[in-house]
Amino acid sequence: MNNKFIQQIKCWFTFLFIICSTFSAWGAYAQTAKVTLQMDNVRMEQVMNEIEKQTSYFFIVNKGVDINRTISINVADKPLGIALQAMVAGTKTEYKIYQQNIYLSVSSDKKAANNGSTKVSGVVRDTKGTPVVGASVVVKGTTIGTSSGLDGAFSLQVPAPAQTAELYVNFIGYDPVTVKIGTQTFFAITLKEAAEQIEDVVITALGIKRSEKALAYTVQQVKSEAVTTVKSANFVNSLAGKVAGAVINTSSSGVGGSAKVIMRGMKSIMQTSNVLYVIDGIPMHNFTSDGSMEFGSRGTTESIADMNPDDIESISVMTGAAAAALYGSDAANGAMLITTKKGKAGATQIQVSSNTEFMNPLRLPDFQTRYGTGRKGKASGSTIHSWGAPLNQAARYNYSPEDFLQTGHILTNSVTLSGGTEKNQIYFSTAAVNSKGLVPNNKYNRYNFTFRNTSNLLNDRLILDVSGSYIIQKDRNMINQGVYSNPLVSAYLFPRGDDFSLVKAFERWNPARKIYAQFWPQGEGGDLRMQNPYWIAYRNPRENSRKRYIFTGGITYKITDWMNVAGRIRIDNTNSLYTEKLYATSNPTLLENSKKGKYTETRGEERQTYGDVMLNISKTFKEKFALDAHIGASIKDNRFDELSVYGPIAGAPNIFNVVNLDKSQKKTPKTGWHEQTQSFFYSLELGWKSQLFVTTTGRNDWASQLANSPQKSFFYPSVGVSWLPSSTFNFPEKFNYLKIRASWASVANPFPRELTIATHPYDDTISGWDDKSNYPIGQLYPERTKTWELGFDARFLNGFTLTASWYRADTYNQTFNPNLSASSGYSDIYIQTGHVRNTGVEASLGYNHQWKNWNWNSQFTFSWNKNKIIELCKEWYNPITEETISMNRLQISKLGRAKFILKEGGSMGDLYSTTCLLYTSDAADDRISVD
């Protein structure tokens, strides 16, 4: 998708934003405009002039209205509607507000009295007592009607005989109400939100609303309260323990760091097993910064962490591949569907939220304090080890890593605004997250701004939904999981025989070099020695700044009552700047032996563009059969570019600027990638008597990763059946709902990018291009996951719900690099083999009951998953060496002495330690020390 097209889309969204803002202002201002009038014995015209001065409204007076009559009015900071009612009280004048005008006309009471009609009035409110503005009030069976005003009030003439007539009150988003008039002339009407009636409707793939009883797979609903009651900077962490079958692990990066969500076990050897995030039916590529190893220093962040939890209406969690098959390969590991809030018609509502959280470590590793600084039972004054001579009680400093950590806090403040008319609703929110971490000099700040406008046009046949978000994030020293740039390592390993208070003054003036130098007596280890943890925090700062903007637009056109066509588009761009400053006297390996420091500056850009169009059909035949069909196409285009400049400082020490770098050692690596997937999909559901449902879906992807491969695209189907015995048979009243379901799905996943064409990376060590490439070229096939699921859903004893599922997922044809010898001139050799199986059970038991004015809601979840490597590599033929290879063991990666090893019969994620343990007997007290 070229830049010109993207620019046109941006201009189009800007135009829609301005137009929708203008329309929404008419309705919103009418509900919020307030006036103050304290006028006695003045002409009505004078009151009208004062209202025009205090608001942006103008009066239009019809013939017969006496604006010269004397009135008195006394209102202070009241809505415009109340002031107008006070102005016309006791007169034969009535008013009506339309856009920016207030129309005054002669009341029709006198005429009504002559024809025998009756005037009735009332007020329309919601369940919270808030006036409902613009509610339709109609005399049933006639065309006589009106709308409720700014304060929810209404009045109209009911033709004779009024005693037998009925009022029909309706408003979008609420259940309609019918009341009989009888002899009553005033009515207080309460409208309930329609969600209370359609609670069995859930959001599924592509934002499609489906009846819960028709689903052949597990979809767990999570309300917004789950992520807003106790807020986390990354709302995903708030879902831990609330979704059966999902394991949520927080990263080591602290506040704002990424969260790893694994549903139903790890499946792929070399590719991600993380969940897909979908916002308002549109999938989002979750850009995640790479984690660090021994020498890394950059923490991990992700795109989903930018989201404001107060913007979330609900979350639907699909743990199985069948549930998310319409999203294709991205959803092979499950999907989390997020529905955001939109404006609600009625009086403008403003919500202010403030949340403060204090943080202290819940538990730290256990450390020994009996042995002092040194090794093998011998004292040493310049080592990081704590296995020296035994310490007597007086020589123990009782140091704990908690002495290095501080009490952290997270301050979250947000404001949301919602309102509008029945035809146009607006939503706006802003939020700020400000945090100080547990580690000194660790900070995280994020600011969110969101706008959304929904309009019903062309007699409600056309729905236009546009939104925009702008996010600013700044963080400092997000903790990485490495060794030499992680302050926690040296804080944990600080010798128990040394005084930690001495190293808190982490730098000393060096008169010879005329700079402040690192103070760290525990300097054993040469070039790989640890550093003072305070020096890392304050003199190895890592700062990241991100600016992200998102534009989303959707149009739905209603062709008939049972058919509509919808189109959506989303543009999501992020610009980032990352800097790392290593002061002089830092670890010489990290400084590349520079005596003056080192500086890194990295600029990155992430771009996502998504668009789809879909035809939706929902029709019932002969009151027995129901058809729900969806067919559509989509395009997804993701890009990432990053340019770095780094090197040792050549000029004045500790002056961090790219122009101060050593030109002979300065490096400017550039990385990036571009992926595009074009898709065609369908979903077909057939229902019989609302008790038996058969669903099938299909999707075909043309992924750019498959270019120059034998299989240019891949198709993945799913099929499911659900049956409601509680509707087929007469169940006892206390056991009122039972659904049995089964589903099967096959989901494909393309292999990693850049494996189908020869690639030659730039090698900084030789200042040229590497002449080696990977093997094979053009002979790779997609990975495939096949899933079975059986389960049931039950409701009983007036409030209990029970959901249980059994599943099995088998992943085949995995692509990985076994680090085989590539002596024939290839950089890497990739093989496709392997079989990983996940078998498990999910269950959730809930209870929800309402007692008049209070509610009890609780839920218990249970998950069990067995991950097993069935086959790793069996009789794979190596065309380079002409050997047949079989492997039942493969080392994927390592961190120090810890190794990630795959073994047949083992499971994904098994870690093995090869550390040698040295036991030294202490004859004095017969204790054993471990070195």
What name fits each language-model region?
Residues 1-451, 456-457, 462-465, 471, ...:
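Short, small/polar-rich motifs associated with maturation and membrane association
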Residues 258, 312, 333, 693, ...:
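Active-site lining segments that contact anionic ligands and/or coordinate catalytic metals
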